[in-house]
Amino acid sequence: IYFGLQTNNNIVTNSKNRSEFDYPVSSTENAENVYEGDAGLSLNFIDRFILGIKEGDLNLAFSANVNSDSKILTNRNIIERAKTLMPYLLYDEEPYMVVNDAGELIWVLDAYTTSNNYPYSQKTTLQLDTLTKLELNYIRNSVKVLINAYNGDISFYITDETDPIAMAYKKIYPDLFAEGNIPSDISSQFIYPEFLYNIQSDIITRYHDIQPDVLYRGDDVWDIATHNTGRVSTKTGTTIEPYYTMVDTIESDESKLGLVLPFTPNEKQNIISYTVGTYENGQPKLTIYKFEADSNILGPMQLDTQIEQDEEISNEIEALNVTGTRITKNMIIVPLNNTLLYIEPVYQEYINEEDSVPTLKKVIVASGNKLAIGNDLEEALQNLVSQYAVNIEVENPDNVDDLIDAIIKANGNLKESTSNSDFEMMGKDIQRLQDLIDRLEKLVEEENNETNNIISNEIVNNTNVIANEVLD
């Protein structure tokens, strides 16, 4: 990676010995690399001297390792590289990398058109850095910037041609923006930008109801949900930050990577809604899922209270809270069709050790009114599902054919409950299927024993007949 987020210095490629340090293979051996890309400037001594003065590094001119074949790679920070070409866009601070079909590493940098003069629109203020604030009431993710991590090639694409600001820039700089669509092997890997999602989430807390009187009175204001991380007061909690997770939505046939954030009614703790930001067919999609007002879906703080009141779980967590350590948690709520799955990993961190890395110790999961804990996610989910497999009334068929039909039906029910992420029915269906299989094994064994007895009796009878005939 020659162009990235932390590549802030100039480098020289194809130096006198050509080989570059790549990574250590052992304590005494290093892997080496030779740059074969097209990026870089081939400069003579005077040009290198001028560049060295500008950059404050005269080694560019006087180093014995720099020769006529050397190339100098400059402006390697991808955000600064984009700003140099197009300074009139607002750039996301968290670009991400994808791999195209050719195996090349490509940075995807989201760019935004903004304005503070859109009529009748709520203003918001962004803290861009310690000293810089940006006030705006219009923002659109209308431009994607693709940067090759190896050779620095950069392309600007307009992804929303209904944005008048973006289209105005295209007319001003017609050669800057690439024509045509973004290659599908790249666009299929787009994710919803968290920077934009945070702005939208803040606005959605107030502007989500289309009824003017409700909006005017402020009767239906939301808060972003909070949770107990173990680092602050358990009464106030910490505001949940958006997180990426695989989501199953009602209108989708397959899981998708989406940004998720739950909301609660103003100054209350139960979940009233959640938003999911996904990319579908190369376009961003933000969906609000709202529960009925009387649904009373548990919020993270309420669930933490239930966890503390669960004797088995609280004892396991307390056993981790030894002197010199700190217990931290991070709740994730995963939408699964028409239900929510709560996942809370529990970490142990040593307080007095420098650079202490939190270690995963337990995972707590919940769905509906059921809680479970395990050493990892798989074990916790198994424990959760097993709680639902109770009080099952089973009518056992009394012959093999009927049992086989019942097993096929039970397996179909299990597939359906699994696809619907219905943990209660999954537990019951698993138990039902296991009972039927056990019953089939027992019935087959009984029939085999009965068959063996019949064969044995026939052999004895035939032997007696033969013996009698011989005696006669």
Describe each model-derived feature in a short phrase.
Residues 1-420, 424-446, 451, 457:
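Soluble extracytoplasmic regions of secretory-pathway and membrane proteins
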